[in-house]
């Protein structure tokens, strides 16, 4: 059971990192900075 939970945690971390990277690329290309749900999840919006 522990191996399954580790796989799920790794998948969640990868999804959050990918979403933040996509938002960062979008912000750089568009020039607009808007707080997104993924940024709030990782705590970037509060900084």
Swiss-Prot record:
Lipidation residue positions, type S-diacylglycerol cysteine: 20
PROSITE patterns: PROKAR_LIPOPROTEIN
GO cellular component labels: cell outer membrane
InterPro entries found in the cross-reference section: Lysis_col
Lipid-anchored residues (N-palmitoyl cysteine): 20
Membrane topology term: Lipid-anchor
Keyword Lipoprotein: yes
Signal peptide: 1-19
GO biological process, one term: cytolysis
Record carries keyword rRNA-binding: no
Major site of localization recorded for this protein: membrane
Cellular location(s): Cell outer membrane
Keywords noted in UniProt: Cell outer membrane, Lipoprotein, Membrane, Palmitate, Plasmid, Signal
Function: Lysis proteins are required for both colicin release and partial cell lysis.
Name of protein: Lysis protein for colicin E5
Native species: Escherichia coli
């Amino acid at each position: 059971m522990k191996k399954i939970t580790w796989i799920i945690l790794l998948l969640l971390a990868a999804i959050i990192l990918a979403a933040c990277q996509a938002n960062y690329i979008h912000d750089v290309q568009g020039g607009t900075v808007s707080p997104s749900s993924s940024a709030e999840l990782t705590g970037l919006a509060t900084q």
